[in-house]
Amino acid sequence: MNWINKDTEIYCSFAKNAGNTGCQMMNTAFYYYGLNKVYKSFSINDIGKAVDSVKTLNIKGFAITMPYKIDVLNYVDEVSNSVQDIGAANTVINNNGYLIPHNTDYLAAKQFLIDYVGDELYILGNGGYSKAVQSAAKSLNIDYQVITRDGWGSIQNIRHSTSYNCTPVENIKVSDTNKFIDCLVKTKTGKRLATMQASH
């Protein structure tokens, strides 16, 4: 059994409303591989102060979720071209006080979308996660349209296409003729995406 001690490395996630999925997945992996690491999720209201705490406490890395995936880029030390092109990050590595963001949402979305090439793609939402999906679609030459909340009523009129929910909205109704990808981790596709994202 692993015991937390003075040498335990800390990893975490920051969200408006923290969940347990990351804690369960990451701590299970740490335990399985006998790693002296622990993962904890935090609900926060100020991403800037949260990032400051990472440096103060020497937290080794952190995940970011809604609604901070875009804003976090204002508080890191370096932004790669790929992250800059996406305009959002979901993972930050602390390299001795130097914070470098990454976007594993993009990698998972690209891996997932390969199975859906050929369909017209509708991306629901335009936040940080949506930006990763948009970049993944572009990289695969998939034509897509973004539907924001103002156009929400049009979702039920979409036929013979793929809809990709990038919002926290649950139970979205789509036509039976559509494929539906939901990023919410409590859904079947959301669990697959979370596993793919964590593997990167």
Regions found by a protein language model. Name each.
Residues 101-107, 113-139:
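Glycine-rich adenosine-cofactor-binding loop
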Residues 124, 139-155:
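NAD(P)-binding Rossmann-fold cofactor-contacting core
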Residues 37-39, 121, 144:
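Hydrophobic anchor at the start of a short beta-strand
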Residues 171-200:
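Rossmann-fold NAD(P)-binding glycine/threonine-rich loop
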Residues 67, 164-171, 184-185:
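Short glycine-/small-residue-rich Rossmann-like dinucleotide-binding loops
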Residues 51-55, 152-161, 174:
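Short amphipathic alpha-helix with an adjacent loop that forms part of the alpha/beta core around
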Residues 2-116, 193-200:
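Phosphate/diphosphate ligand-binding glycine-rich loop within oxidoreductases
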